[in-house]
């Protein structure tokens, strides 16, 4: 990218003054926050597979004096605590660390922790499980539709798939991934198409257009590193006017690829699934003077599943978009591996990384450090990025306490005055992210893991001149956590 659930009902005079100031100017990238200085290349398997059963924190009774612990269990963070008895009264259904109790106030109540490192309470966390996070989609203006989508089983057992098409450099039904996808689109219909990709390296840019039928793209090997789709476009790379960048984001009038156009793989079709693959953007950003954003995977569709998929890059590795700011589109990443250094998990989509390894690369940023997540969630959407049951690891040689968990990407905003104007209008980004029940390595900053936004909106977990940031944690462990 480029270098709340709480809403304000009225704006302070200072904010109104900013709003009246207005401002102009284009975002440095067509689709990402302006990053810290950058440079780099691209690898491993998650330690804890999604779906492994982890015990939730004890639930808490809901009566004023109810603090009795309930039993808690979870699989993907969705088990509920069994209402514990309060000290003299009955608890109202305690929530496990990843569970749904009978009550709860979302993020309307007070968090725990510190102002700089807020922690969700058990009741608040109950509203932010995998299934709660993904249960709704649609248009914010007309009201989201609850379809209770449950993708936690993943893409399925590849041993039971019968391929419609096969891709192999030595010759299957197709020699490139894109040609097989094109064939699936041309065939039409609504039945799922299975495309098996043989082990090997495929150097190409791939687009799954919105017109595609449901597609499952997979390799048979559980070693995702054996099947690699890679390319090296980046934001500032020049291109001829009239030439398409990524076909899913053609940017024909542009003279550079732009962030969205840099994507190695773009998935724009609903119900797309991928399993046992590596998708990489291997731009050497250290050799690039500007426009370093280089996306590996970009999505802009609903009900997407990526299982055992490795995503390699540096800045802007994983970009989850929506067709527009008012649309909620969902994606689920199970047992994945994502690496990068600046804003490398970002976008305004609603998505979950479950049982993943998220690895920070230090070679390019050095002592400067970087940011892991950069959500640009619409302020009306309570669910942006959820990282759960995952491991945040780090490349050897990274100093302790160097890296931020993230920052809000104020997408489409040029500066604080522009942001203030957007807030006054009621349509504005306020990135939402929760990292919970995960293990944080020593590279994470202990006291202040959340940075100011991409337009320098100061981080604050309470509303003031600007809306409160929506960046929280819950029940994390490890040397980089709030309770190491």
Tell where the protein language model's regions lie, with residue ranges.
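Sequence-level preference for short, compositionally simple segments enriched
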Residues: 109, 113-484
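Ser/Thr-rich, Pro/Gly/Ala-heavy low-complexity intrinsically disordered linkers and tails
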Residues: 23-112
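Generic alpha-helix initiation/capping and coil-helix boundary signal
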Residues: 7-14, 29, 173, 329, ...
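Sec-dependent bacterial lipoprotein signal peptides
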Residues: 1-21
């Amino acid at each position: 990218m480029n270098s709340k659930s709480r809403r304000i009902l009225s704006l302070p005079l200072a904010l109104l003054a900013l709003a009246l100031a207005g401002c102009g100017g284009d975002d440095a990238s067509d689709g990402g926050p302006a990053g810290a200085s950058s440079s780099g290349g691209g690898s491993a398997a998650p330690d804890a597979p999604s779906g492994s059963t982890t015990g939730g924190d004890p639930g808490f009774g809901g009566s004023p004096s109810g603090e009795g612990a309930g039993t808690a269990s979870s699989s993907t963070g969705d088990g509920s605590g069994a209402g514990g008895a309060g000290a003299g009264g009955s608890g109202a259904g305690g929530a496990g660390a990843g569970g749904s109790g009978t009550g709860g106030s979302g993020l309307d109540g007070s968090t725990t922790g510190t102002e700089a490192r807020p922690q969700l309470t058990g009741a608040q966390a109950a509203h932010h499980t995998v299934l709660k996070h993904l249960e709704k989609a649609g248009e914010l203006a007309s009201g989201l539709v609850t379809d209770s989508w449950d993708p936690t089983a993943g893409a399925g057992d590849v041993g039971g798939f019968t391929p419609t098409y096969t891709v192999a450099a030595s010759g299957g039904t197709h020699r490139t991934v894109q040609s097989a996808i094109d064939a699936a689109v041309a065939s039409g219909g609504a039945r799922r198409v299975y495309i098996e990709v043989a082990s090997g390296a495929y150097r190409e840019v791939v687009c799954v257009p919105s017109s595609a039928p449901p597609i499952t793209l997979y390799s048979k090997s559980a070693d995702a590193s054996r099947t690699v789709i890679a390319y090296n476009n980046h934001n500032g790379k020049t291109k001829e006017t009239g030439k398409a960048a990524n076909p899913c984001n053609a940017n024909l009038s542009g003279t550079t690829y732009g962030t969205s156009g840099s994507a190695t793989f773009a998935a724009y079709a609903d119900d797309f699934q991928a399993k046992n693959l590596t998708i990489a953007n291997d731009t050497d950003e250290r050799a690039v003077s500007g426009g370093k954003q280089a996306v590996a995977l970009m999505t802009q569709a609903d009900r997407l599943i990526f299982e055992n998929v490795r995503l390699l890059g540096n800045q802007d590795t994983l970009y989850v978009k929506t067709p527009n700011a008012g649309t909620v589109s969902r994606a689920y990443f199970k047992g994945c591996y994502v690496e990068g250094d600046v804003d490398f998990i970002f976008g305004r989509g609603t998505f979950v990384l479950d049982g993943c390894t998220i690895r920070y690369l230090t070679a390019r940023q050095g002592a400067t450090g970087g940011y892991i997540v950069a959500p640009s969630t619409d302020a009306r959407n309570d669910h942006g990025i959820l990282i759960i049951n995952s491991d945040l690891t780090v490349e050897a040689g990274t100093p302790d306490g160097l890296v931020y968990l993230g920052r809000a990407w104020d997408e489409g905003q040029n500066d604080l005055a522009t942001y203030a104007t957007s807030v006054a209008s009621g349509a504005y980004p306020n990135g939402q992210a929760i990292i919970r029940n995960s293990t944080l390595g020593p590279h994470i900053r202990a006291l202040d893991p959340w940075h100011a936004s991409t337009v320098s909106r100061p981080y604050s977990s309470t509303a003031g001149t600007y809306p409160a940031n929506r960046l929280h944690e819950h029940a994390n462990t490890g040397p980089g956590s709030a309770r190491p």
